[in-house]
Amino acid sequence: ELGGWDKKGVDRAPLAAGIVADNCPETGIDHCRRVVRMCQLAYDELGGWANEISKLDHDTLICGAVLHDIGKFLEYDIKDGKACHSEMGKYYNHVVSGAYIAKSNGLPDKIVHMILEHSDMQSPANTYDYPELMMMKKLDHMCFSIAWMAYPCK
């Protein structure tokens, strides 16, 4: 079983071990839910207009938002009550392991790419932007940055 997280533990999964302080009330699941809600709000506001000019696809946007941090369940662990990098997480960050999970479960390449490219850690150049990735990436970055500014790891 990859990651070793159970249903109870998933709710305690960290937002980002070593980057955001352990006392940050925003968990990884909270963050993913927030990114999904923000993507839905942005789509509701911009969807019709953005769809006319860029063919923004709602299902791709939301699927990418739901799964963008799926690899964190392989990257992180809880030891002695504190968030830390797992053995696998020492070698692969969450975008790599998340893309692996998505690809090995038959998800479309566009979703795999959204997982792989959503973080500036992996690809700051934005070599291939399409509207769903651009929107999700910017909203993810905004949500993460607010938590990080409020609870920086010292």
Segments predicted by a language model, with ranges:
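Divalent-cation-assisted or electrostatically stabilized phosphate/pyrophosphate-binding catalytic cores
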Residues: 82-104, 129
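Histidine/acidic-rich helix-loop-helix segments that form or flank divalent-metal centers
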Residues: 50-52, 56, 61-62, 99-103, ...
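Acidic/His-rich, divalent-metal-binding segments that scaffold phosphate/diphosphate chemistry
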Residues: 1-85
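Histidine-centered active-site/metal-ligand motif
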Residues: 31, 68, 94, 99, ...
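A broadly conserved amphipathic alpha-helix scaffold signal in soluble, globular proteins
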Residues: 37-40, 44, 96, 100-103, ...
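Alpha-helix boundary/interfacial micro-motifs
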Residues: 80-81, 85-86, 123, 151
